[in-house]
Regions:
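Conserved beta/loop motifs at nucleotide-recognition and modification sites
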Residues: 1-319
Length: 319
């Protein structure tokens, strides 16, 4: 039977902290300023063990929690994790210990195994797009607004699949739409923040479609908020992927075979195959060289980022 004095929350940050806050609320500990002790970062094992040894004051339970216990992952001290694991049997019955970590825990570590055996472990994988969309709909209801599933999907596409981002964007959109109003797709397109990945996708699409003016306008907007190095890196990744697909197509490989070789799904491979059709393998190789030169020029300050990126992108896309 699980020990309800031991909790481990791991994975996606929003859900981890939500679970911790729900635990704190459910315990309803008296005099929390004395009986609840929280560590934002991981203390050493001795300090944590000492905190756990304390007795509650005028309360049934005492809560000790760590919001970023890195010893549960490959980043933190395995020795500290082992030391705490060996002490769990000696925790007072009045102490509730909750450990949180962002990302997947290292299940090989003794501490994880002990929590899995003795306590309650909850793991939260990164959300999928449909889960983020459903979350957006619920957040809109909390704000007194209405948001359809379809429009929520548009929001996730533009802003990214991240609970914190979606929560903030829905709050902003609810204010923009007005009390009790429905958040429309047009509201989302006008107000929602775009992820860098989405902006790169839009830039790439405009350049593939030979819309030089539209691409230049969007590039100027993106460079107002993003570092140019990040854009260059994502364009380099796009052209590396096109180069790989083009090379395999030239060898006679089919879409399914390419997807298996590159460990990608078939649909992205089909898109890449369509996009690289107008380029030769040699052109794509030369584009990667030009992007490397652009990266150096921007990082070294040799050239103005807007001018250098515009010239390079128009050249490598053949405009």
């Amino acid at each position: 039977m699980a020990n309800k004095n031991l909790y481990l929350f791991a994975g996606e940050r929003y859900m981890v902290l939500k679970s911790l806050n729900e635990l704190i609320a459910s315990l309803d500990i008296s005099i929390p300023e004395i009986n609840v002790t929280g560590f934002r970062s991981m203390p050493d094992a001795d300090a944590l063990i000492e905190a756990c040894a304390g007795l509650p004051l005028m309360a049934e339970k005492r809560l000790i929690y760590v919001t970023d216990y890195t010893a549960l992952t490959g980043e933190g001290s395995a020795e500290d994790a082992k030391k705490l694991a060996n002490h769990l049997d000696r925790l007072p019955d009045t102490t509730v210990l909750a450990l949180c970590c962002e990302g997947l825990p290292d299940k090989r570590r003794v501490l994880y195994k002990r929590f899995a055996e003795m306590g309650i472990v909850r793991e939260f994988p990164p959300p999928k797009n449909n889960e983020c969309a459903a979350f957006a709909v619920e957040q809109a209801k909390k704000q007194g607004a209405r948001l359809s599933g379809t429009t929520a999907g548009v929001l996730v596409t533009l802003a990214g699949c991240d609970y914190y981002t979606i929560e903030n964007e829905v709050q902003k959109l609810a204010l923009y739409a007005g009390a009790g109003a429905e958040i429309s797709a047009e509201h989302v397109r006008q107000c929602a923040a775009r992820t860098l990945d989405y902006n790169i996708f839009e830039l790439h699409t405009k350049l593939i479609q030979r819309d030089a003016a539209g691409a230049q306008s969007l590039l100027a907007d993106v460079l107002d908020t993003e570092r140019p190095e990040g854009l260059v890196g994502l364009f380099a990744k796009k052209f590396r992927d096109m180069f790989k697909v083009k090379s395999l197509l030239d060898r006679g490989s089919g879409i399914r075979q390419i997807a298996e070789t590159l460990k990608m799904k078939e649909y992205p491979v089909q898109m890449l195959a369509s996009e690289c059709a107008r380029f030769s393998r040699e052109h794509l190789k030369e584009a990667l060289i030009k992007l490397a030169e652009l990266d150096y020029a921007v990082k070294s300050g040799e050239r103005d980022p807007m001018i250098a990126m515009t010239q390079t992108l128009l050249t490598i896309y053949g405009l």
